[in-house]
UniProtKB/Swiss-Prot annotation:
Organismal lineage: Bacteria, Bacillati, Cyanobacteriota, Cyanophyceae, Gloeobacterales
Family affiliation: Belongs to the ThiC family.
Short name of one Pfam family: ThiC_Rad_SAM
Keywords, comma-separated and alphabetical: 4Fe-4S, Iron, Iron-sulfur, Lyase, Metal-binding, S-adenosyl-L-methionine, Thiamine biosynthesis, Zinc
Name by which UniProt lists this protein: Phosphomethylpyrimidine synthase
Keyword Signal part of the UniProt annotation: no
InterPro entries in the cross-refs: ThiC, ThiC/Bza_core_dom, ThiC/BzaA/B
Species of the source: Gloeobacter violaceus (strain ATCC 29082 / PCC 7421)
């Protein structure tokens, strides 16, 4: 496996995180690999990891991982969520979703399974099959361990599950440590309250016990687990807005301030961190949200869900959210969490995964172009040349979804002869504007014809 020898050389180290080695001035094999993938200098990647602006989620128990970077210096990344529920799916279906997500360009995948069989077996199968980083939300399995009875949850239950996930090879975990008991009254004026599953569990626990969030009070113990396996924090935004009305409110920003404090606490132990963000945010507030996160969290990579820019399109929320995601990426968000057409409606199937992922690959790519990332537009230019030259097969190859592009073309013109035709079914053979080729000789003749003629002298 790719990383087996790299990992073996670190055996016995108390801290095996990429941040720890980067702060020692070392360029690890993972750093070099990411630098090559991103066409960046290895020293730049190392310095960004050391600073905390870039993370490389790479658990030492995930040896078949192909390392990738998440940060402002790298391409804008896309995460795909999969996972079985008590009402739908199973291990085989989730592994198939993983393979589909990787095929269509997911940079990371989160297993959000809450049921549907043996959660440990599902997670293990996904990690073993995955070349991309895998994330989880350990609170879900912690709740299952007490049969859904939130009041019976203990810090020990939660820490045991976190360590189990780390030992299995999970590369990053959503840890909802930022929601504090004093934040709960701030949700009173909301339309949709708390919409984070993990945050909702912890809110109910705090209300039942009148005690502080156990993930907050035991944060240093989680740090100690993470540095043993190089697990990255994905600090969860439990109080993210669940609708336009609730965006950018006091509850959201109170938690964000705490997430910044936790980020810096993890950094003191050389543990990698990214910070999760909203959610549902109107377009005119997205830039402010990104800037505020950078300020509060000392430029730790920002990882946002959408955001959805309107709430009135169930069944089309891959579109409402991709609009917000493109803007968030442009303003500096490091990773976008995809949303599928099934959002708010049901568990996504394989086709939903494909549709949501392609929408988000478009958003991330558009953000890279807008950010002026070197080489970001190269593929666009190459596809445009193929389009202008009626090289249909090359157009399909360069598409984000080659199968869908070919399928749509072939609905009306399936015969092979039309793969070299200088038209498609939209314009037909007589009206395609790209048949108009203006060469240099034609331009020279045109310029000569338009050149003012000398006026004859009058006698």
């Amino acid at each position: 496996m790719l990383r087996t020898e790299w990992i073996a050389r670190r055996h016995g180290h108390a801290n095996v995180s990429q941040m720890y080695y980067a702060r020692q001035g070392l360029i690890t094999e993972e750093v070099a690999y990411v630098a090559h993938r991103e066409n960046l200098e290895p020293e730049l990647v190392r310095s960004e990891v050391a600073r905390g602006r870039l993370i490389i989620p790479a658990n030492t128990n995930h040896p078949n991982l192909e390392p990738m970077g998440i940060g402002i210096a790298t391409r804008c990344k896309v995460n795909a969520n999969i996972g079985a529920s008590p009402n739908a799916s199973n291990l085989g279906e989730e592994v198939a979703k993983l393979e589909l997500a990787v095929k269509y360009g997911a940079d990371t995948v989160m297993d959000l399974s809450t049921g549907g069989g043996d959660l440990d077996a599902i997670r293990s199968a996904i990690i073993q099959a995955s070349p991309v980083p895998i994330g989880t939300v350990p609170m879900y399995q912690a709740l299952e361990a007490v049969h859904g009875n939130v009041e019976k949850l203990t810090p020990e239950h939660i820490l045991d599950v976190i360590e189990k996930h780390a030992k299995q090879g999970v590369d990053y975990m959503t840890i909802h440590a930022g929601i504090l008991i004093e934040h709960l009254p701030l949700t009173q004026g909301r339309l949709t309250g708390i919409v984070s599953r993990g945050g909702g569990i912890l809110a109910r626990w705090m209300l039942a016990h009148h005690k502080q969030n156990p993930l907050y009070t035991h944060f240093d113990e989680i740090i100690n687990i993470f540095k043993k396996y190089d697990v990255s924090f994905s600090l969860g935004d439990s109080l993210r807005p669940g609708c336009q009305h609730d965006a950018s409110d006091a509850a959201q920003f109170a938690e964000l301030k705490t997430l910044g404090e936790l980020t810096r606490r993890a950094w003191t132990h050389d543990v990698q961190v990214m910070v999760e963000g909203p959610g549902h945010v109107p377009m005119h507030q997205i830039e402010m949200n990104v800037r505020k996160q950078m300020q509060e969290c000392s430029e730790a990579p920002f990882y946002v869900l959408g955001p959805l820019v309107t709430d009135i399109a169930p069944g089309y929320d891959h579109i409402t959210s991709a609009i917000g995601a493109a803007l968030a990426g442009w303003y500096g968000t490091a990773m976008l969490c995809y949303v599928t057409p099934k959002e708010h409606l049901g568990l996504p199937n394989a086709e939903d995964v494909r549709t949501g992922l392609i929408a988000y690959k478009i958003a991330a790519h558009a953000a890279d172009i807008a950010r002026g990332r070197p080489g970001a537009r190269d593929r666009d230019d190459e596809l445009s040349r193929a389009r202008y030259n009626f090289d249909w097969n090359r157009q399909f190859e360069l598409s984000l979804d080659p199968e869908r592009a070919r399928e749509y073309h072939d609905e009306t013109l399936p015969a092979d002869i039309y793969k070299s035709a200088e038209f498609c079914s939209m314009c037909g053979p007589k009206f395609c504007p790209m048949q108009t080729k203006i060469d240099s000789q034609a331009l020279s003749e045109l310029e000569a014809a338009l050149k003012p003629q000398p006026v004859a002298a009058q006698e």
